[in-house]
UniProtKB/Swiss-Prot annotation:
Name of the gene encoding the protein in the UniProt record: NDPK1
PTM note: Autophosphorylated.
Name of the protein: Nucleoside diphosphate kinase 1
Molecular-function GO terms, alphabetical: ATP binding; metal ion binding; nucleoside diphosphate kinase activity
GO annotation (BP), single: UTP biosynthetic process
Function: Major role in the synthesis of nucleoside triphosphates other than ATP. The ATP gamma phosphate is transferred to the NDP beta phosphate via a ping-pong mechanism, using a phosphorylated active-site intermediate. Also exhibits a kinase-like activity towards histone H1.
Catalyzed chemical reaction(s): a 2'-deoxyribonucleoside 5'-diphosphate + ATP = a 2'-deoxyribonucleoside 5'-triphosphate + ADP; a ribonucleoside 5'-diphosphate + ATP = a ribonucleoside 5'-triphosphate + ADP
UniProt cross-references to InterPro entries, sorted A to Z: NDK-like_dom (IPR034907), NDK-like_dom_sf (IPR036850), Nucleoside_diP_kinase (IPR001564), Nucleoside_diP_kinase_AS (IPR023005)
Positions that bind ATP: 9, 57, 85, 91, 102, 112
Sorted UniProt keywords: ATP-binding, Kinase, Magnesium, Metal-binding, Nucleotide metabolism, Nucleotide-binding, Phosphoprotein, Transferase
Membrane-crossing segments per the record: none
Cofactor(s) required, per the database record: Mg(2+)
Family: Belongs to the NDK family.
Amino acid sequence: MESTFIMIKPDGVQRGLIGEIISRFEKKGFYLKALKLVNVERSFAEKHYADLSSKPFFQGLVDYIISGPVVAMVWEGKSVVTTGRKIIGATNPLVSEPGTIRGDFAVDIGRNVIHGSDSIESANKEIALWFPEGLADWQSSQHPWIYEK
């Protein structure tokens, strides 16, 4: 099974969207493998977004991520990276489809509620960064009702 890193950003936490977001991933049939509420340190945020460090919006993004707690999660399931991105919606909420998290809950690109890994490689990197202690080893009893053999 594939894994992805999902982070509910400070605006999503402050607006009380944690349960709604978790529910959407659970209803799709994905399994929560790790979760923590974190106040992110500046140096850690800079490491997480290191690939964007040359962009003009980098400092604003870092300031935003450290402005309040985030919920860091790992989800597991078939094609969870690609499907997770579809559940999340386009980076710019104004072009996100209704029914996606950003399409339903966000307006500004700088307050777009959620982050999701964009590839298996970035998922592996982000999971290792955010969860060096490892993930929960379990499988839902619903597994055979969601996935074929």
